[in-house]
Every structure is written in C-alpha cells, then in structure tokens.
A protein has these predicted regions:
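Nucleotide 5′-phosphate-binding alpha/beta core
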Residues: 1-116, 120-122
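AMP-binding/adenylate-forming
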Residues: 99-112, 126-180
Length: 180
C-alpha cells in the first residue's frame, strides 16, 4: 500500500521540526483572528509553544466552555475565523455545541485515516453514520471522497434496507455504527 502523502514518511526529527514551525503560527493565528482565543491566549508567548510538552502549558478548552460561549455569542462562541456565512454547514453535537463544516479539501482531515484502512477508488463505502444534525456522516463522507471511493450515504436505521443495499450495489466497506 502506498502512503497517503509524504507527511507519513517523515523522520521523527522532521516531524518535531515541522511541529515546531507550524504550531506557534497556528496558535498565533487563532489568537489574532478569533474573539475567544484572543481572550484565552492573550497572556501567553505563543512563539515559544513549539512542542507537545510546551503545548500542555496552555489552558484546555472544555466542551462546557464552548457551549457557554456559544450561548453568549451564537452560533460559534467566538471560536471561528469569520461568520456562519463562511461555512457550508452548521452542525449541532451533544452539549449542545454548534460546529462549522465544509465539504472540500479533506476539511475534516479523515482522508489519511480512511486511506490507512485500505479504502480507495475501487471501493463503495456504505456510510452508516447519521447525517441528521451531527457532523459524523459528513465527516466520514468527506474522508471517503478524499481517497476517491464512492459513498452510499445510508445513515442509520432500517437494517433490512441497509443489508439489501449493501448487496445490491456491491458495498466493499461499511463505516458507522452497526446497530440499526
């Protein structure tokens, strides 16, 4: 099996070097372009956060904090760059928390994972994650499309129809919860 991309064949030293370069830039971008991370990260010298060890010195953002911030500043609580009109989707996950979503360029970053499973352009993947309100269905569909496979957006439930569809269309992989 070939690698998803060259990131997978980096040496340990190259991974650490890449992280040291990218991590502070990403944190500075979050601080400089989002209201909430500006508040959370304002007292830290983010240029010195260049490793996993130094990242652990920053405060953890908890789901309950996101939910509370979103009540005060709907829909995303000041955690995103831009407004809701910058995104193709808005999802609601338990909490509730609202999450933005896109469908292009492996936005959810699951392509590498799907590729590691051996799924590729000759596969038909039956996506049994829900497409209703939560992001799981779209997240996995996006990853499957990234590796060139075909998606059957089955969602959840209706086990007899699920089994028939898998047989009728030649499904080669199933992802999701197999509790129908």
């Amino acid at each position: 099996m070939k690698f998803f991309d060259d990131l997978e064949i980096r040496t340990k030293e190259k991974r650490a070097s890449d992280l040291a370069a990218a991590l502070p830039l990403q944190l500075i971008h979050a601080r400089d372009h989002t209201k909430t991370y500006r508040e959370i990260l304002s007292e830290f010298d983010l240029s010195k956060v260049t490793s996993l060890a130094s990242l652990s010195s920053l405060p953890i953002t908890r789901k309950s904090s996101i939910s509370q911030a979103q009540k005060s500043a709907p829909p995303f609580g000041g955690y995103t760059v831009g407004t809701s009109s910058n995104f193709e989707h808005i999802f609601q996950s338990p909490g509730p928390i609202y999450e933005p979503g896109q469908t292009s360029n492996d936005w959810w970053r699951l392509g590498r994972f799907i590729h590691a499973l051996g799924i590729g352009n000759n596969d038909i993947v039956q996506n049994c994650f829900s497409y209703h309100m939560t992001p799981a269905g779209m997240m996995f569909e996006n990853g499957v499309k990234t590796v060139g496979a075909t998606v059957f957006p089955a969602g959840i439930g209706q086990s007899e129809l699920q089994v028939r569809a898998a047989s009728d269309i030649g499904v080669t992989a199933i992802q999701g919860h197999l509790i129908f």
